[in-house]
A protein has these predicted regions:
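Alpha-helix termini
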Residues: 22-26, 51-59, 155-157, 194-197
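Extended, charge-rich low-complexity interaction segments
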Residues: 22-40, 191-200
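Short glycine-enriched nucleophile-adjacent loop
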Residues: 40-54, 66
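Hydrolase active-site cap/lid region
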Residues: 59-110
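Eukaryotic short linear interaction motifs
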Residues: 2-4, 40-43, 74-78, 139-141, ...
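Active-site catalytic motif of lipid deacylating hydrolases and related acyltransferases
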Residues: 1-31
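Serine-hydrolase catalytic core
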Residues: 93-193, 199
């Protein structure tokens, strides 16, 4: 949760990832992003650094594909974190209200960063193909939000987008609950990108 509510920490993590990707041993390798849950929010920090810092700009051109499993960005944080934390409706409501209050109080600083990164994520500057995984009963990653993002990338950004929406599986547990379908979708995605598929 600290990474979600502290943009500076998220930026540090994003910087570490990008430094690895531009290292001598990795700088010529193709990249496939595979983000889970708040990895969608962390990916927005990666996108921001690639756009704003020249030293990371080469990574953008090397991203061949993007896999997002149950992505949660800024707008889903109060809903997602509170639902992940407790089954108790009162505790969920208190936590959701507390997070919303935190974001309102620190709007001048934290929320401004969140909104800018959310906008960047939804208007993804990386136009390589994307694959979404989500489920209809995920208590953290809202199905309508995931679907709207996939549709926007496909219809407004003209990206190649595939998706696998499961009837039922818990947050970021789609691989375990629907192992065969998940694995086949990833393999097909990588084959379509012309990237060798390793044995999973």
């Amino acid at each position: 949760m600290l990474q979600i509510l502290r943009p500076k920490k998220a930026e540090q993590v994003a910087t570490e990832v990008l430094n690895k990707l531009i290292s001598d041993e990795n700088k010529h390798r193709p990249v496939v992003i595979h983000g889970f849950s708040v990895g969608g929010y962390l990916y927005s920090h990666v996108l921001n650094l690639m756009v704003k810092q020249d030293r990371f700009s080469s990574v953008k051109e090397r991203i061949r594909g993007q896999v997002l499993d149950s992505p949660v960005d800024f707008h889903g944080i109060p809903y997602g974190v509170s639902n992940a934390a407790s089954e108790n409706p009162l505790v969920r409501w208190l936590m959701k209200s507390s997070i919303e209050a935190y974001l309102a109080i620190f709007a001048r600083y934290t929320t401004k960063v969140y909104l800018a990164h959310s906008h960047l994520f939804h208007n993804n500057p990386v136009r390589s193909p994307a694959l979404f995984f989500f489920s209809k009963d995920d208590k953290v990653a809202d199905v309508d939000t995931c679907q709207a993002c996939a549709d926007y990338w496909k219809n407004e950004l003209n990206m190649t987008v595939s998706q696998q929406c499961f009837e039922s599986s818990p947050h970021v547990s789609h691989f375990y609950v629907h192992n065969k379908e998940y694995t086949e979708a990833v393999k097909k995605f990588l084959r379509d990108l012309n990237i060798p598929v390793v044995t999973l």
